[in-house]
Amino acid sequence: MEQFQVYLELNRSRRHDFLYPLIFRESIYALAHGHGLNKSMIFFENQGYGNKFSSLIVKRLILRMDQQKRLISSANDSNQNPVFGHNNNLYSQMVAAGFAVIVEIPFSLRLISYSQGAEVAKSHNLQSIHSIFPFLEDKLSHLNYVLEALIPHPIHLEILVQALRYWVKDASSLHLLRFSLYEYCNLKSFITPKKSISIFNPRLFLFLYNSHACEYEFIFLFLRNQSSHLRSTSSGVFLERIFFYGKIKYLGEVFYNDFQNNLWLFKDPFIHFIRYQGKSILASKDTSLLINKWKYYFVDLWQYYFYLWSQSGRVRINQLSKYSLDFLGYLSSVRLNPSVVRSQMLENSFLIDNAMKTLDTRIPIISLIGSLSKAKFCNTLGHPISKPTWADSPDSDIIDRFVRICRNLSHYHSGSSKKKSLYRIKYILRFSCVKTLARKHKSTVRAFLKKLGSEFLEEFFTETEEEHAFSLIFPRGFFALRKFDRGRIWYLDIICIDALVNHS
């Protein structure tokens, strides 16, 4: 964020609401071409124009925009009177990239002020993805149902602009956004997977989608707080909203002023909500009747308030004891562990059956093999194949790449309850490495292994640094007795999901 303050010289109290003049600053496009707000934020570069993103073209773009008296035109007139001339595609993508950086400034300033005022702990251990699973072990095992709802996409671009106007108070910036959307996106297929991303700036696309999803989440969290005896705790930042309580009043009118009378049906202190990969996931201890009421509440909220057509079939309800939740690269489910206790009182003895609920985390082997298949490590059936694009590299680089991928997957999936699936992934990567090396040296796999020996690829199965540290602390018999290799280990240094794990 310090980069923004150096480049833009913003005054937090007065100037951050007027973002439109920043589109004429060269430093904005330099930040857009770099890494954005800070090094931790992911920036998606434009595939077709990365090599043309030069300072000369940026200056030419700013000069052309400054000379234009009418930047905003209707969608019908855009084809007849293009704003940017022959380089329409290039200039528009550059403007979209710059606007994607600009529109994040108010959020970043508020986030910094919130962190400074709340004195949020800056422990890196709390940022680990694995730190979520101990929480799930403690909470999810006591819940009964999980509700998964696919978030509907807006069918009209104006819905996106209307959702963003509560965050960005600069009307000129919104007009620029509206112009860009109508200029280069089809009204019916703007938010469709993998189509608009190649046309429009991916960073701006993700920002608009998150703004659209957060719009209904604020209302959901508000009603959830009103209907529960306990206050909800969020890991995010509740930012200031305009006309928020007016929206709640309007929502009550949509439900014919009877919604407040029915709030008692939703009283549930054991409820957890999260949004993940285009889905709203709600886990609850409610009965099947009450969880079905939440299902139709989601549908009504989307249809009557956001004017988005949705069907009840897009919302699925499953029992945690019979269903596995695909979350953060693990299949999580609640498993019953039966146990029998023998009790004796005087001369009478009897058996007590007791079942304890525990969280079972498994590797999604099918989806992970699908990711390996897309990356050309194996075929769709999981049979290892060679990696021809790496065959030109030195042998040490090829082995290092495969070993690094194998160790990263082993490190991330160390919390799996069953390690057999992980051994299968290691097998695929091991023989894919062998076939790649054999392809490079124009030999068969058998002849190549016979020439170099079986110890050639032992790095795939050597113990990790963590396992070596445990072996120094505990005696060797401890691992065999306790079956330590089957236990789950959650690490506190994993801050991102591997590309192969994040298959969707």
Swiss-Prot record:
GO BP terms: mRNA processing; RNA splicing; tRNA processing
Single GO cellular component term: chloroplast
Keyword terms: Chloroplast, mRNA processing, Plastid, RNA-binding, tRNA processing
Subcellular localization, as worded in the UniProt entry: Plastid, Chloroplast
Single GO MF annotation: RNA binding
Function: Usually encoded in the trnK tRNA gene intron. Probably assists in splicing its own and other chloroplast group II introns.
Entry similarity comment: Belongs to the intron maturase 2 family. MatK subfamily.
Protein name (database record): Maturase K
Native source organism of the sequence: Kokia drynarioides (Hawaiian tree cotton)
Gene name of this polypeptide: matK
